[in-house]
C-alpha cells in the first residue's frame, strides 16, 4: 500500500521490471535483483499512466559489465528452517469434554459421544500434529562479464520451500539472460526471464480453509482407522462434519497442485539520430501458462463422507504484448540542462480459461476422459488493449531551480468509445537551496532541497466489458406441455458512461543532508484525492435479477506525512555503522459513495455476517459493530435493562453478554451498530540498524504499526460453543455466579442471547505491534586466505520474525487482505513463519 488506498478496486501497485510491466514480482529470483525503488508522488509516477495511482515499484535486475572478457561467477547457497511463530491455546480432550458437556447440560442434552470415556480415546493436539519444522533451500548461480562493446548476465536459481503445514510445498526454477551491445550511435539488447513453479497449496475450499480445519478438529478424533474407507478416523454424534486433517494432506485422498510457467522478454534497439536526440524501440512480450488439478477420492470420515471420485482440471493462458516507441533528448547549454521524452505505447493483453470436471473415475486413473458421470466443462476469454501517448520535459538552471512537466493520454478498451481516453498531467518544482551563494558559508550543510508537485493519475483496474451488456444462457423454463425451452436473461446491463478513475495528488517535501552526509532526512506531506471511483450501485430486484451495474460514484481522500531519518558514520577504517527510522502517518476518508445511504459491506464471517462497511464520512473498511457492556450478573440486571417496560434482551440470563442499545429503540439489531475503528494504522514504521567491525557485519530490522483494529473472526468461531468442534482454551474461564469476571460468558449449547454474535465488538482487537523482523550476522573472509581463485566469500546466519510484541490474541497481527473491504479481517489466517537461515556467498 503506497500512500494509502485510493480505490475500492485493484489497489496493487504497478511493477516495472527493467521496463517490463508486471502484476507482481513473486516469480522473480531475488538474487537477480540489483535495486528496488518506489515512486510515490504523482509527478514521478505520471509517466507510467494506468495503475500508477496506486504507486509504482521500479525493479532493476543485475546486468553485465566490462570485465575485459573474464567472467565473474557468483554462487549463493541458503539453507533454512521455518516454524510457526505462535500456536493458539486450544482445548485438550479433558477441557473440550468439560466445555461441551456443561454447555449441553444447560439445555438438558447429554454429553457428546466423543466427549465421554476419555480413558479410551486419544488426546490429539492437532496443531502439533499438522504443523512442522519446514525446510527451505535456495541455490543461485550467476555469470556476468563483457568487453568493450557487449556485456552479459546469466542467472540460474532454484528455490524449494516446504510449508509449515504438512503436505504443502512450493518450488520455483528461474533463469535470466541479459545481453547488451553498444557501439557508436547504436545500442541493442535482450532480457529474458523464465520461471517455472510447482505449488501444493493449502486447501481453501474447506470450512475456514485448512487452518480452520486444523483448529476445529476435536482432540478425541482418531488419527487412523483401517476400517474406514481412506484409512482415517471419523467423527460421530452431534459434532461438526469437517474433513480429517491428515486425510486432507494425503495425495491418495485429496491431490491438488498448481503449475505455472512465466516467460518475460524485452528486446530493444536504440540509435542516436543526432547529438542529444535518441530513438528507442522496446518490444516486450510476456506469456504465462497455468495448470491446476484437484482430485478427490472416496473417503469416510464419519460425518464427512464422499462416495464418488471427482476430478477438476483447469488451464489458463495469458499473453501480453507491449510495444514502445520513445524519443529522448538530453542536452546541456551552459548553465541550462534540458531533457525531454516523447513516446507512443501499445499494449495488447489476452486471456483464455478452460476447465473440465468429472466424477466416477476408476481408482488410479486421474484423467477427465475416465470420468463416468457428471462431466462438465467451461471456458471463457477476454482481450484488453491500452494505447498511450506520453511526453515529459525536465529543465534545470544552475542545478538550483528544477522543473518537470509530464502529460500522458491513455486509451483503454475497458471503457466505452465516448470515455475511452483519459488525460493525466503533472508537474513538479524543485529548489536546491544549498547551491545558493548565501549558503556558501554553511559548511556543515551538504544538501537542502525543497520540492513540490501536483499530478493526476488514472486507474482502469476493473473487469473487461463492464460498459457492455452481457447475457446469461442455459436458463430453462417450462413450455406448458411438459417440456423445457432454452432461455436467457441479462447478467449485466450496459453502462457506456463509465470512465477512468482519477487520482489527483499534491506533494511537498524536503531533502536534507549534513555533517559530511552522515545525517540525512527526507520528509513529505501529501494530499491524495481520488474521484470517479468505479462502484457497483444497487438496482431494484424488479430489474430481472441482473447484477448491480458499475458506475463512477465514489470519492476518497488520503493525506499523510512520511519521513526517512538516518545517520551513518565510519569513525575509523575498522568500524562503520548506520541507523535509520522510516515512518508514515496516513488517514483515509470516503467522501462519497454514489448515494447518501450507499455503502460496501465487507469482512464476512463464516455465518455470512458482515463486520465492516465502507461509507461516506468514514475510513475505508471501517468496523461497524454492536457495543458490549459486560455481563448480566443477576436476573435483576436482566429485568432492569428495559425500554418502556419491555426487556431489551428478553432471551438473556445471568452470565450472558449485555449489548448496547445504541439507538435507544428497545431492540438489539443491526441498527445498533456504531463505528468502532479502522483496519488501517495511524502510523507505520520501521527501524533498521547495521554495524561493521573489521570483517564482521550485523544488521537488525524492526517494524510495526500503531492505531489499527483487527476483527478476530478466528476467535469468534473458536469461542462459539453451540457446535461440536474444538474451542479456544479461554472457554474454560466461563461465567458462573462464583466467577463473574470470567473472560467467556456462560456456557450454553443453544445460546438464545447470541453471545457469540459476529456483529459485536467482542472480537475487535487492538492491531498495534512491534516485530523484530530480521537479525543477520555475517563474516567476510579476508582475501589473503585465497590464492586468486576466489575474489570474495561471505558466510552469514539470519533469523526472521524472532518475536512480536502485541496484545492481539490471534496467530499474527499482520492481517492484510488484497481486498480493501477485508483489510484487518482475520478468518483463520496462516501463522507467521519464524525462520533461521544459514547462507554462503562466493564470487570467483
Please name every model-derived segment.
Residues 116, 127, 412, 705-800:
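Extracytoplasmic gating/loop element in the C-terminal half of outer-membrane beta-barrel translocons
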Residues 1, 7-9, 13, 55, ...:
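Residues embedded in well-ordered regular secondary structure
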Residues 8, 22-24, 42-47, 64-67, ...:
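Short beta-strands and strand-coil junctions in structured, solvent-facing domains, enriched
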Residues 676-711:
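Glycine-rich, aromatic-lined ligand/substrate-binding cores of catalytic
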Residues 12, 137, 172-173, 178-196, ...:
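Extracellular/periplasmic, surface-exposed regions of secreted and cell-surface proteins
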Residues 1-3, 13-18, 35-39, 56-60, ...:
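Soluble periplasmic/extracytoplasmic beta-strand elements of cell-envelope proteins
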Residues 74-121, 466, 568-678, 719, ...:
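Conserved small-residue
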Amino acid at each position: 500500500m503506497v500512500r494509502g488506498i485510493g480505490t475500492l478496486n485493484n489497489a496493487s501497485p504497478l511493477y516495472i521490471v527493467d521496463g517490463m510491466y508486471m502484476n507482481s514480482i513473486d516469480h522473480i529470483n531475488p538474487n537477480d535483483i540489483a535495486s528496488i525503488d518506489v515512486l510515490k508522488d504523482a509527478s514521478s509516477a505520471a509517466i507510467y499512466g494506468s495503475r500508477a495511482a496506486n504507486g509504482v515499484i521500479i525493479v532493476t535486475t543485475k546486468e553485465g559489465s566490462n570485465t575485459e572478457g573474464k567472467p565473474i561467477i557468483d554462487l549463493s547457497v541458503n539453507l533454512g528452517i521455518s516454524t510457526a511463530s505462535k500456536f493458539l491455546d486450544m482445548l485438550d480432550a479433558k477441557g473440550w469434554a468439560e466445555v461441551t458437556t456443561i454447555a449441553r447440560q444447560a439445555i438438558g442434552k447429554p454429553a457428546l459421544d466423543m466427549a465421554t470415556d476419555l480413558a479410551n480415546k486419544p488426546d490429539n493436539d492437532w496443531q502439533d500434529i499438522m504443523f512442522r519444522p519446514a525446510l527451505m533451500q535456495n541455490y543461485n548461480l550467476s555469470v556476468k562479464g563483457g568487453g568493450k562493446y557487449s556485456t552479459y548476465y546469466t542467472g540460474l536459481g532454484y528455490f524449494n520451500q516446504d510449508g509449515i503445514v504438512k503436505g504443502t510445498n512450493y518450488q520455483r526454477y528461474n533463469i535470466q539472460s541479459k545481453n547488451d551491445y553498444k557501439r557508436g550511435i547504436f545500442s541493442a539488447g535482450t532480457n529474458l526471464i523464465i520461471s517455472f513453479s510447482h505449488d501444493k497449496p493449502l486447501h481453501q475450499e474447506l470450512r475456514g480453509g485448512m487452518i480452520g480445519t486444523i483448529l476445529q478438529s476435536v482432540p478425541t478424533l482418531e488419527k487412523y482407522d483401517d476400517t474406514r474407507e481412506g484409512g482415517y478416523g471419523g467423527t460421530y454424534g452431534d459434532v461438526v462434519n469437517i474433513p480429517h486433517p491428515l486425510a486432507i494432506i494425503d495425495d491418495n485422498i485429496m491431490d491438488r497442485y498448481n503449475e505455472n510457467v512465466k516467460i518475460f522478454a524485452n528486446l530493444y534497439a536504440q540509435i542516436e539520430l543526432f547529438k542529444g536526440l535518441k530513438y528507442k524501440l522496446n518490444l516486450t512480450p510476456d506469456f504465462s501458462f497455468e495448470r491446476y488439478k484437484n482430485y478427490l477420492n472416496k473417503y469416510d470420515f464419519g460425518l464427512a463422507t464422499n462416495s464418488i471420485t471427482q476430478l477438476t482440471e483447469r488451464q489458463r493462458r495469458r499473453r501480453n504484448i507491449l510495444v514502445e516507441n520513445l524519443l529522448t533528448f538530453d542536452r546541456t547549454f551552459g548553465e541550462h540542462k534540458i531533457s525531454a521524452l516523447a513516446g507512443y505505447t501499445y499494449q495488447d493483453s489476452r486471456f483464455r480459461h478452460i476447465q473440465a470436471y468429472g466424477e466416477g473415475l476408476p481408482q488410479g486413473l486421474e484423467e477427465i476422459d475416465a470420468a463416468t458421470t457428471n462431466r462438465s466443462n467451461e471456458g471463457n476469454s477476454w482481450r484488453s488493449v491500452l494505447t498511450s501517448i506520453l511526453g515529459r520535459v525536465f529543465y534545470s538552471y544552475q542545478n538550483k531551480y528544477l522543473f518537470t512537466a509530464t502529460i500522458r493520454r491513455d486509451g483503454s478498451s475497458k471503457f466505452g468509445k465516448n470515455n475511452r481516453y483519459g488525460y493525466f498531467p503533472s508537474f513538479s518544482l524543485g529548489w536546491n537551496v544549498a547551491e545558493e551563494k548565501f549558503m556558501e558559508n554553511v559548511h556543515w550543510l551538504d544538501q537542502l532541497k525543497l520540492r513540490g508537485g501536483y499530478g493526476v493519475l488514472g486507474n482502469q483496474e476493473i473487469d473487461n466489458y463492464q460498459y457492455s451488456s452481457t447475457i446469461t444462457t442455459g436458463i430453462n423454463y417450462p413450455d406448458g406441455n411438459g417440456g423445457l425451452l432454452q432461455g436467457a436473461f441479462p447478467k449485466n446491463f450496459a453502462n457506456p458512461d463509465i470512465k477512468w478513475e482519477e487520482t489527483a495528488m499534491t506533494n511537498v517535501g524536503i531533502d536534507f543532508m549534513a555533517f559530511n552526509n552522515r545525517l540525512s532526512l527526507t520528509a513529505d506531506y501529501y494530499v491524495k484525492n481520488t474521484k470517479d471511483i468505479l462502484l457497483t450501485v444497487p438496482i431494484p430486484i424488479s430489474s430481472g435479477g441482473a447484477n448491480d451495474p458499475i458506475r463512477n460514484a465514489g470519492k476518497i481522500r488520503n493525506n499523510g506525512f512520511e519521513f526517512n531519518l538516518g545517520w551513518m558514520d565510519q569513525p575509523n577504517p575498522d568500524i562503520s555503522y548506520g541507523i535509520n527510522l522510516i515512518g508514515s502517518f496516513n488517514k483515509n476518508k470516503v467522501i462519497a459513495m454514489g448515494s447518501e445511504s450507499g455503502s460496501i459491506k465487507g469482512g464476512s464471517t463464516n455465518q455470512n455476517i458482515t463486520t465492516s462497511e465502507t461509507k461516506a464520512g468514514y475510513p475505508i473498511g471501517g468496523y461497524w459493530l454492536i457495543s458490549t457492556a459486560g455481563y448480566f450478573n443477576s436476573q435483576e440486571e436482566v429485568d432492569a435493562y428495559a425500554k418502556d417496560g419491555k426487556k431489551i434482551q428478553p432471551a438473556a440470563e445471568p452470565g450472558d453478554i449485555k449489548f448496547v442499545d445504541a439507538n435507544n429503540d428497545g431492540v438489539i439489531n443491526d441498527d445498533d451498530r456504531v463505528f468502532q475503528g479502522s483496519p488501517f494504522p495511524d502510523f507505520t514504521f520501521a527501524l533498521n540498524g547495521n554495524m561493521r567491525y573489521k570483517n564482521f557485519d550485523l544488521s537488525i530490522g524492526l517494524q510495526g504499526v500503531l492505531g489499527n483494529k483487527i476483527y478476530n473472526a478466528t476467535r469468534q468461531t473458536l469461542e462459539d460453543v453451540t457446535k461440536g468442534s474444538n474451542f479456544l482454551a479461554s472457554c474454560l474461564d466461563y461465567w458462573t455466579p462464583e466467577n463473574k469476571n470470567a473472560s467467556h460468558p456462560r456456557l450454553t449449547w443453544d445460546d438464545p442471547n447470541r453471545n457469540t454474535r459476529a456483529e459485536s465488538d467482542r472480537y475487535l482487537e487492538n492491531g498495534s505491534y512491534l516485530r523484530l523482523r530480521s537479525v543477520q550476522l555475517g563474516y567476510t573472509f579476508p582475501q589473503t586466505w585465497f590464492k586468486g581463485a576466489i575474489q570474495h566469500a561471505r558466510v552469514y546466519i539470519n533469523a526472521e520474525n524472532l518475536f512480536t510484541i502485541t496484545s492481539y490474541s490471534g496467530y499474527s497481527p499482520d492481517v492484510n487482505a488484497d481486498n480493501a473491504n477485508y483489510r484487518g479481517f482475520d478468518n483463520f489466517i496462516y501463522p507467521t513463519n519464524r525462520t533461521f537461515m544459514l547462507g554462503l556467498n562466493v564470487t570467483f
